[in-house]
Amino acid sequence: MAKAGYQPRLKKHYEEAIRKQLLETFKYENEMQVPRIDKVVINMGVGEATGDSKKPSVAAEDLALIAGQKAVITRARNSIAGFKVREGMPIGAKVTLRKDRMYEFLDRLVNVALPRVRDFRGLSPKSFDGHGNFAMGIKEHIVFPEINYDKVDQIWGMDIIVCTTAKTDDEARALLKAFNFPFRQ
């Protein structure tokens, strides 16, 4: 639980500056129409889980360290013989962040993790889904400072989905640019 009176830096920035900026840019009639970030979903698929059932739980522990919240182990919905996957087998982990934890994670992602990614040239501006949500992938989970590089036995990638209340991709792009997301030109 957060301390009384504490407010994440990005949330404060949104309420004081970004909301007013977007209100003027897109000419909304009401302040409640201004898009905001609704949630962030972090998914870590562990493809090698078919051979070792402990790997999804290790991935869930790493994800919990990164997100600051307990991760849920995801299970296969149906069997796929080609991948040697049975229905109900653990195949990954995911976390859904909302409110203060979401803002704290986005702050660490934009200011600490993304600059540590090797050969990073910016986020693709085409990764929006048409409804104002943004998806991105990270190839190595060790770019986050919470992960101790010496204790990691295997490096996994992760998907990060930023869900917004924006109606269009342009609104969502403007919102995320205001949060200093480093988009490619």
UniProtKB/Swiss-Prot annotation:
MF annotations from Gene Ontology: rRNA binding; structural constituent of ribosome; tRNA binding
Assembly and binders: Part of the 50S ribosomal subunit; part of the 5S rRNA/L5/L18/L25 subcomplex. Contacts the 5S rRNA and the P site tRNA. Forms a bridge to the 30S subunit in the 70S ribosome.
tRNA-binding in keyword set: yes
One GO CC annotation: ribonucleoprotein complex
Organism: Chelativorans sp. (strain BNC1)
Family: Belongs to the universal ribosomal protein uL5 family.
PROSITE patterns hit by this protein: RIBOSOMAL_L5
Coiled coil: none
Protein name in UniProt: Large ribosomal subunit protein uL5
GO BP annotations listed: translation
Keywords annotated in UniProt: Ribonucleoprotein, Ribosomal protein, RNA-binding, rRNA-binding, tRNA-binding
Role of this protein: This is one of the proteins that bind and probably mediate the attachment of the 5S RNA into the large ribosomal subunit, where it forms part of the central protuberance. In the 70S ribosome it contacts protein S13 of the 30S subunit (bridge B1b), connecting the 2 subunits; this bridge is implicated in subunit movement. Contacts the P site tRNA; the 5S rRNA and some of its associated proteins might help stabilize positioning of ribosome-bound tRNAs.
InterPro entries referenced in this protein's UniProt entry, alphabetically: Ribosomal_uL5 (IPR002132), Ribosomal_uL5_bac-type (IPR020930), Ribosomal_uL5_C (IPR031309), Ribosomal_uL5_CS (IPR020929), Ribosomal_uL5_dom_sf (IPR022803), Ribosomal_uL5_N (IPR031310)
Keyword rRNA-binding part of the UniProt annotation: yes
